Amino acid sequence: MVPWLGPDDPFPPVERALSAASGAPGLLAASADLLPSRLIDAYRRGIFPWYSDGQPVLWWTPDPRMILRPREFKISPSLKKTLRRVLRDDTWEIRVDADFPAVMRACALAPRHGQRGTWITSDVIDAYSTLHRRGEAHSIETWHAGKRVGGLYGVSFGKMFFGESMYAEVTDASKIALSALVFHLRRHEIEMIDCQQNTSHLASLGGREIARKAFVAHVRAAVDSAPIPWSFDKSVLRDLLAPAQ
């Protein structure tokens, strides 16, 4: 039985999440609210919300957990060629937090294979936008010829980044944004990006699964570190493309 959380109820221990045999592996709790304080507490415990419009807020902590270590990020030859072109061409830009709510709205509209509708509702956008105003959620955006053509957003506490969603209106636009984010995180010695659930796309970029116990232990140690700065541009890609020392 999944517990229902009232406004003042704490999350149960992550070990109580449903198992694979339940049909909803990783489901921990449900609630009616998506308050910023609840969101912050969730991320700091390795928990995230994911639900469909019309459902209660469902809180998840899957085991295993998909992560991407910035040092293990895989750049294919074609992506490397694209990144070099982006660096040479002044019409391409990386902007950080230029329009966070717009990035969320674009992610909500992006078609997803095997998924109908979106969980990124207006209430979700409002909640994450509050975190953004607090400096705890960020958008990394790919711009071309003065137009935003792709990007991603996520939540950041201390030395931990929790990826949420990405979109692309032109080929590789989301990968360009992710590449810039990865090197920014490498520069600041961030060891892990939370990717939540396994997909072949994330695996192709170097993502892999780890046990929930190891993930939660890392999160609890990382989130209390000093926050990193969130100001960078496409010049970070120069170091990403440099030969390993």
UniProtKB/Swiss-Prot annotation:
Annotated source species: Paraburkholderia phymatum (strain DSM 17167 / CIP 108236 / LMG 21445 / STM815)
- Please write the reaction equations for the catalytic activity of this protein: N-terminal L-lysyl-[protein] + L-leucyl-tRNA(Leu) = N-terminal L-leucyl-L-lysyl-[protein] + tRNA(Leu) + H(+); N-terminal L-arginyl-[protein] + L-leucyl-tRNA(Leu) = N-terminal L-leucyl-L-arginyl-[protein] + tRNA(Leu) + H(+); L-phenylalanyl-tRNA(Phe) + an N-terminal L-alpha-aminoacyl-[protein] = an N-terminal L-phenylalanyl-L-alpha-aminoacyl-[protein] + tRNA(Phe)
- List the GO terms this entry assigns under cellular component, sorted alphabetically: cytoplasm
UniProt enzyme class: transferase
Q: Which gene encodes it?
A: aat
Per its record, how is this protein called by name? Answer: Leucyl/phenylalanyl-tRNA--protein transferase
Superkingdom of this entry's organism? Bacteria
Function of this protein?
Functions in the N-end rule pathway of protein degradation where it conjugates Leu, Phe and, less efficiently, Met from aminoacyl-tRNAs to the N-termini of proteins containing an N-terminal arginine or lysine.
Query: Mind listing the UniProt keywords for this protein, alphabetically?
Result: Acyltransferase, Cytoplasm, Transferase
Q: Does the keyword 4Fe-4S apply?
A: no
**Localization, UniProt:** Cytoplasm
InterPro entries registered for this protein in UniProt: Acyl_CoA_acyltransferase, Leu/Phe-tRNA_Trfase, Leu/Phe-tRNA_Trfase_C, Leu/Phe-tRNA_Trfase_N
Give the matching Pfam families.
Leu_Phe_trans (PF03588)
Would you identify the family this protein belongs to, as annotated? Belongs to the L/F-transferase family.
**Gene Ontology molecular function terms on file:** leucyl-tRNA--protein transferase activity
Give its E.C. classification number.
Answer: 2.3.2.6
Which Gene Ontology BP terms does the record give?
Answer: protein catabolic process
